[in-house]
Amino acid sequence: MKRLLLLEDGSVFEGEAFGADVETSGEIVFSTGMTGYQESITDQSYNGQIITFTYPLIGNYGINRDDYESIRPTCKGVVIYEWAEYPSNWRQQMTLDEFLKLKGIPGISGIDTRALTKIIRKHGTMKACLINEGNSIHEALENLQKSVLLNDQIEQVSTKLAYASPGVGKNIVLVDFGLKHSILRELSQRQCHITVVPHTTTAQEILNLNPDGVLLSNGPGNPEQLPNALQMIQEIQGKIPIFGICMGHQLFAKANGAKTYKMTFGHRGFNHAVRHLQTGQVDFTSQNHGYAVSREDFPEALFITHEEINDKTVEGVRHKYYPAFSVQFHPDAAPGPHDTSYLFDEFINMIDDFQQKS
């Protein structure tokens, strides 16, 4: 069956339908990863987005039980050049097509993803829709241009109830803004006792859990939409060590007076080179974000620790006076290189230092 991809600017791409037989709309973005499609599709940071994979062949090792970043993916669609109808991998349980059908996510293949990516790079991310052949392009485009993207993504993906992942090590409260399971795995490997709490949890509720440290997770959307989270961070910093990742990084920076802005097309993939400004060390990182921390009017209480090599985006900050730091990239690296997984050890060491001084 033929399927059409329509962009807000009027661009139309025709391809073959695969995945779920439904129509959809959302913000279209692109990811430059060669592999890791399962982790990307199940990453809640893609909530409400149609993912374009720039690598030409996707799905060649199928879907397996180990690489989920969430059980219920909330991306809106998948755009690829070619999907592997007959994947081969000893871990696979189903094909990409079967997985998308199971999760109700439509896909389109046979698209010139290079041309599509050039449009997004030039004009920025925009609204898009997937419709089946036979429907009115004019009507679909008119409805798309009138539509409004929702800004309550974190409300959709954050846990509604607190839950624990038992361990014998540090007591960590993990604030869920759209948590990736790989963050849980990294903390569990360090024997942490983890309590995952909703994004609406107050500072006092966190303090009542007597945590050794607080981790602010990744998540979708605009940090401007979370004033309560900013207040929570302001009230706990200095009392408990803090580590922020992705959305958690943006919220931590904003809570200390930094500004954030929407990027033209964002960073999505796991080949982004980041420089540690103090040591000069360059790491390749996994990233998925459409907003970033601005250097403009940068607050006195923070200093920049990392920057992206190509566009100088702020990739990490640290507090001058409190035991707290954050990074824009994903040190859990799922998918992606493990160059920066040491930051979880740095978080644990920061907790030890804070407790010794206290």
UniProtKB/Swiss-Prot annotation:
Coiled coil start-end: none
Top-rank taxon, per record: Bacteria
Cross-referenced InterPro entries: Anth_synth/Amidotransfase, CarbamoylP_synth_ssu, CarbamoylP_synth_ssu_N, CarbP_synth_ssu_N_sf, Class_I_gatase-like, CPSase_GATase1, GATASE
GO biological process: 'de novo' pyrimidine nucleobase biosynthetic process; 'de novo' UMP biosynthetic process; glutamine metabolic process; L-arginine biosynthetic process
Enzyme class: ligase
Similarity field: Belongs to the CarA family.
Name of the protein in its database record: Carbamoyl phosphate synthase small chain
Protein source organism: Streptococcus agalactiae serotype V (strain ATCC BAA-611 / 2603 V/R)
